[in-house]
Amino acid sequence: DVLGQMKYMLSIIIIVFFSFSSLSLSAEKSRYDEPYPAVDSKKGLQVEMVEDALFLGVKHAALNFNVAQLVDPTSDPDNPKWVKDGREYYFNKPYLNKIDSSIKRLSDRGVLVNLIVLAYQSGNAQINKLIMHPKAARERPNSLSAFNTVTEDGSRWFVAIMEFIAERWSHPEKKNGRVVGYIIGNEVNSHWWWSNMGRVNMKDFTADYLRTMRLAHGAVRRQSSWARVYISLDHHWNIRYEAGDESQTFSGRP
């Protein structure tokens, strides 16, 4: 039945995504080919205070990364730019410097750093139009949206963002620090709270998220052969988050 098919969509997305990932690996060679780094500890944190994390001896760190603070639609020539398909995309230098500092202090001490890539609502309507999902609900409980990979401009910006940050932080020279993985969104099966695209059924949500994941994976893989791209599910596992209805949240493991 339709409901039964929908329940399996979040499991299927993983299989389909990695099937397409394998095809993309054979079709396009990465600019930088390295092995995935290894560490001798499982200890990890979602880090806010870098020095505290280092004092605790963590070897895995997750940092929130807000694309709304990154993009510069005004094309300020003092900001770094990325050229994609003949178009120029500019990125906020002060925000990059801030993230550089956190990443480099961690990775220089042997910590494996993962970025949680997020789309927060900003006070800039132009930025919101570029990065936020067109169907994100105004009444959402948090300021987080699914990514805009729906419109042409949104998709172009998303790919440019992912290529730019993979080049910057998964580069062999590590001059800005090193990122080993990119987590696309946060707890997306409870999307109403953490990756909002309005009220939606599981089938339509996963189709949208799969498109975003494929764009992210392709962008990262064009730069790095080894950096990983992750989906993010909540900790409720095989039950739906009870605070939401079936158009707001789905079980992560049917």
What label would you give each PLM region?
Residues S11-S21:
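Bacterial N-terminal signal peptides
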Residues E28-S170, K174-G177, G181-I183, N189-N201, ...:
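N-terminal substrate-binding region of glycoside hydrolase catalytic domains
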Residues G4-L10:
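Positively charged n-region of N-terminal signal peptides that target proteins for export
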Residues L23-S26:
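Sec/Tat signal peptide C-region and signal peptidase I cleavage site
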Residues M6, S170-E173, S224:
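Secondary-structure transition/hinge residues
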